[in-house]
Every structure is written in structure tokens, then in C-alpha cells.
């Protein structure tokens, strides 16, 4: 059930539901932690709900900046929008500029770090401001249709960033007493592995410092992701020798050689995809704010380990020329029960065998990341679940993210880390990406209430 207090367009009969919902939340929080000012919970809900339009305007500004990755462009522009808002809000803040530029643009990635509260105990709010490339330029012209805001990055995950910013602002403006602080981490480069964002911060010892928990605002379709798959992604190039089709005997066909490589990878794929994980992975969709399983879908299929071949492929120069090169990608997604290094060695071993058999090729690692998992029974996991249930009227499911998450950087340091955000995974990266602003508002309230419970005095 979607609780009405987070709607702006309530009718007269629904205002009773507002008061009732706030009372339920206040009562719940009183039971969670004795001495808690239950009235503060309802004040947080009211404060965030009143700012839906303000939040939508900020999100539209962020979506309008095409911070596409790859290649990693307009990072400076989107960072300036965020920086301006954070500074105007009066939060402690610093900007860490990369010393090196991206390979494909002149951009120098910037990590934005903010905090609210005092002490060493830190709950991290983590988000990434880069987005996947758009299918059309129109995707960077945000459109508002009632409660829905359309545009590249609205779902993944600029909408989630806005929710986190306003969660912190609500706690600040309402004078919430925290035993510790909220650390805000806004990074680039997530869509291509995170090396120049979270990876950089981790290497410099800045990520997760004094951390006791972490929340990420990824588009989770109403569930909580407490685990994620690891990844090893490669680009393989097979070489040949060019010749006119009429003289093909003088050439060496790179496409046919590539076919031999792919055949061996398909054999590995069959074995890999016979394995399953114990973690729940059933795809979820939302309809009228209710989380429902996708109909006619075998949920067990999502538990299989993954080896995808040919996400990108290409080669040759013309139909009448023997191709002198062909390339393709391999994307291996690894379940938490599997070992990244062992699976990497098996995958690379197939390519090395092909080389030994006389097939000239080379490969490049595009991304590499470990799987990770945090128990739903951790204090932060329980607090998050309780506050989702309080705001949405239904306890969330805990599932494994089918892809790679930056929660892994925190989990590797023993910090319980979870992803929960306002977007739908089914529209992320798609041609009609959008986010429901009511869900952005809900998530802002959930983040604030979770922080209040987790860090409250």
C-alpha cells in the first residue's frame, strides 16, 4: 500500500490518512528506540512532502546535463549543479578533483564529499552522477508528465541523489539529534566500473572511513539489494589479413577465426550458466506503486550465473573485402558463491588456448569487480526495512542485484551496505527512462527516517 502523506494532490478524505500514517510511523519509531521524539518523524515526512516540486526542479537540472559514460563527459558541469545546491544548503562539503583526464574527453572527474552531524560514526549516503549514453539527444531534455519526470539518468540515479540530498536537508533543518554523522559520497565513473570514482576514493583511504553503514540510491524496483554479482568484462579482437573477395585465398578471414573463438566460449557458457545462487533474484516491477512479480516469468532463471557474448561486436570494412579484424565483448557476471579470480582465469584460459592454437588475438579488461553481500539481519538492514514498511505499508524483499554495485567497496571493508532507490530497474538505461517523483519523495523520507533510527540519540 502506498501511503498518502507523500502525495501533493490529496483530496479532503485523504487528509485523515495523512494524520493516521504519520501517527503509525511515530508509534513505530517510539517502539524502535525509547526516548525518540516521535513527532519528529511526522515532521520529516511533512517537510519532504512539501518539497516535491523543488526536488523535481533540481532533478530536471541534473538530467539536462549529459554526463554520459562512456566516454565520461560533462562531469564538471553536473558536479557544478550539485555543488551549488549543496553549498546553498549549508552542508559541510569538499570537492576532490582528479589529477588525470579521461581518455576519450578532456574531463577531469570530480568526487563530491559532504557530511552532516559530528563524531566518527558515519552512515554513508552514496550515489553516482554519471549516466549511460542516451539513445537520442531528446533524453537530455527533461519532461514532466504529472508525477513522472522523463530523461536519461532520472531513474539511474540522479533521482536517488536528489532523494538523499533532501533527506539530509530534512534532518538538518529540523534539528535531528544524531549520534554520529551522515557522509555524502557523489562520484563519477560508476557505469564503467568506478575506477576514477569510488575506486579512487578507496585507494586513497577516503571511502568508508569510520563507516558503520552505507545506503546507495540505485533503482531497485521496490526491493532492497543486499548483495550483488561480481563482474569481469572483456573486449576481444581477432586479427586476420585483408584481401579482395576475388582473391580471398590471399587473405585471412578474421570473422571465421572469431567464430572459432566464440564456439569455445559458448562451451564455457553452457557450463557456467548451469550454476545457480542461493540469493533471491526474481525480477520485480512496480504498478500503481505496488511491487509485483513479473507475470509468466520463471524466477529461477535469474539465479543462474552469467556469461554473455557479443554485447558489442563489429569488424571488416566492406562486403567485398576479407575482414582483417573482428571484435566482440564478453561480459561475465559472477554469483556471490563464485570466486572472481578463479572465474577470470577460466575465461582468460579459453583465450590463451585459442592463441596457442594459432588464432591471433588480443583482449582488454573493461571492468572487474567483486561480488558482495550484507546480511539483512544487520542493524542497518533491519532499520531500513522497518522504515520502508512504515512509509510504504509493506515490508520489502531482500534480493541480489543482477549487476555490479558500488556497495562492494564498502562491504569489502566490513561495512554493511544496501541499495534501495526510487527508480525501476526495467526502465534504467532504456529509451524512455523516467522516475516517479512520489517515489523520490518517499525515498527521501525513508533515508531520513532510517538515518534517524540508526544514528539517533
Residue spans for each PLM region:
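Extreme N-terminal basic, low-complexity initiation segments
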Residues: 2-12, 17
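An extended, acidic, His-containing surface patch that forms the Zn2+-binding/catalytic region
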Residues: 91, 271-304, 308-316, 360-457
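Alpha-helical metal-binding/catalytic segments enriched in His/Glu/Asp
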Residues: 125, 147-192, 238, 249-269, ...
Amino acid at each position: 500500500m502506498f501511503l498518502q502523506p507523500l502525495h501533493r494532490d490529496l483530496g479532503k478524505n485523504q487528509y485523515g490518512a495523512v494524520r493516521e500514517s504519520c501517527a503509525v510511523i511515530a508509534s513505530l519509531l517510539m517502539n524502535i528506540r525509547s526516548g525518540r521524539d516521535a513527532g519528529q518523524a511526522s515532521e520529516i515526512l511533512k517537510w519532504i512532502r512539501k518539497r516535491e516540486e523543488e526536488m523535481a526542479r533540481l532533478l530536471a537540472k541534473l538530467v539536462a546535463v549529459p554526463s554520459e559514460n562512456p566516454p565520461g563527459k560533462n562531469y564538471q558541469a553536473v558536479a557544478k549543479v550539485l555543488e551549488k545546491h549543496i553549498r546553498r544548503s549549508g552542508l559541510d562539503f569538499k570537492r576532490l578533483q582528479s589529477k588525470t583526464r579521461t581518455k576519450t574527453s578532456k574531463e577531469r572527474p570530480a568526487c563530491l564529499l559532504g557530511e552532516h552531524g559530528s563524531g566518527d560514526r558515519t552512515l554513508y549516503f552514496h550515489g553516482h552522477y554519471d549516466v549511460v549514453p542516451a539513445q537520442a539527444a531528446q533524453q537530455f531534455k527533461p519532461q514532466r508528465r504529472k508525477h513522472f519526470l522523463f530523461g536519461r539518468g532520472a531513474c539511474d540515479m540522479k533521482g536517488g541523489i536528489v532523494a538523499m540530498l533532501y533527506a539530509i536537508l530534512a534532518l538538518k533543518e529540523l534539528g535531528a539529534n544524531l549520534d554520529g554523522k551522515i557522509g555524502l559520497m557523489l562520484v563519477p565513473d560508476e557505469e564503467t566500473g568506478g575506477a576514477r570514482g569510488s575506486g579512487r576514493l578507496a585507494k586513497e583511504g577516503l571511502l568508508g572511513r569510520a563507516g558503520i553503514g552505507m545506503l546507495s540510491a540505485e533503482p531497485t524496483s521496490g526491493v532492497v539489494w543486499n548483495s550483488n554479482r561480481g563482474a569481469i568484462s572483456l573486449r576481444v579482437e581477432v586479427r586476420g589479413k585483408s584481401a579482395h573477395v576475388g582473391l580471398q585465398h590471399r587473405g585471412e578471414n578474421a570473422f571465421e577465426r572469431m567464430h572459432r573463438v566464440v564456439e569455445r566460449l559458448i562451451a564455457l557458457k553452457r557450463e557456467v550458466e548451469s550454476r545457480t545462487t542461493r540469493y533471491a533474484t526474481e525480477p520485480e516491477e512496480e504498478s500503481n506503486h505496488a511491487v509485483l512479480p513479473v507475470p509468466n516469468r520463471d524466477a529461477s532463471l535469474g539465479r543462474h550465473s552469467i556469461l554473455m557474448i557479443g554485447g558489442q561486436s563489429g569488424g571488416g570494412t566492406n562486403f567485398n573485402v576479407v575482414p582483417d579484424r573482428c571484435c566482440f565483448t564478453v561480459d561475465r557476471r559472477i554469483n556471490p558463491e563464485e570466486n572472481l579470480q578463479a572465474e577470470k582465469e577460466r575465461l582468460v584460459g579459453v583465450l590463451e588456448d585459442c592463441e596457442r592454437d594459432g588464432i591471433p588475438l588480443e583482449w582488454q579488461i573493461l571492468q572487474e569487480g567483486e561480488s558482495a553481500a550484507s546480511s539483512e539481519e544487520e542493524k542497518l538492514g533491519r532499520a531500513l526495512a522497518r522504515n520502508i514498511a512504515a512509509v510504504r505499508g509493506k515490508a520489502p524483499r531482500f534480493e541480489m542485484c543482477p549487476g555490479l554495485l558500488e556497495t562492494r567497496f564498502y562491504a569489502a571493508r566490513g561495512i554493511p551496505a544496501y541499495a534501495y532507490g526510487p527508480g525501476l530497474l526495467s526502465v534504467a538505461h532504456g529509451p524512455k527512462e523516467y522516475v516517479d517523483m512520489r517515489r523520490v519523495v518517499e525515498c527521501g523520507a525513508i533515508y531520513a527516517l532510517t538515518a534517524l533510527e540508526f544514528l539517533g540519540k
